[in-house]
UniProtKB/Swiss-Prot annotation:
Protein name: Lysozyme C
Tissue specificity field: Stomach-specific.
UniProt function note: Lysozymes have primarily a bacteriolytic function; those in tissues and body fluids are associated with the monocyte-macrophage system and enhance the activity of immunoagents.
Species, as recorded: Bos taurus
Source organism superkingdom: Eukaryota
Length: 147
């Protein structure tokens, strides 16, 4: 019985933690989901963005007190503009998706929303990209990855 309780807590901690992608694994996944070159944004730039936004973690969240909104998932997509978390005042829900879905281990919905965002606002919609990736050599983010 004790072993079952310990095993239950282990599974619970994995479910709460989410998936933290390995860099090349994420590169392959993003390429498969059509982000490489999407709207002129290279795969290396997407990897740089996700590294600085979430450290490749699907369950990452960040509360923004000034806007009373939260950033969700591997792309840190904001609940004020892009997803519905049921608690952000005057939310727009531009991607027509639940914020919870943006934190799934299967990142297809998060990628679809990121595509929508970059189509409307460009890659500069992400502050981390402007701070850490723009005007930098980002080639190291895909270096050594078998794509």
């Amino acid at each position: 019985m004790k072993a079952l309780v310990i095993l239950g807590f282990l599974f619970l901690s994995v479910a709460v933690q989410g998936k933290v992608f390995e860099r090349c694994e994420l590169a392959r996944t993003l390429k498969k989901l059509g982000l490489d070159g999407y709207k002129g944004v290279s795969l290396a730039n997407w990897l740089c963005l996700t590294k600085w936004e979430s450290s490749y973690n699907t369950k990452a969240t960040n509360y923004n007190p000034s806007s009373e909104s939260t950033d969700y998932g591997i792309f840190q997509i904001n609940s004020k503009w892009w997803c519905n978390d049921g608690k952000t005042p005057n939310a727009v829900d531009g991607c027509h998706v639940s914020c919870r879905e943006l934190m799934e281990n299967d990142i297809a919905k998060a990628v679809a929303c990121a595509k929508h965002i970059v189509s409307e606002q460009g890659i500069t919609a992400w502050v981390a990209w402007k701070s850490h990736c723009r005007d930098h050599d980002v080639s190291s983010y895909v270096e050594g990855c078998t794509l």
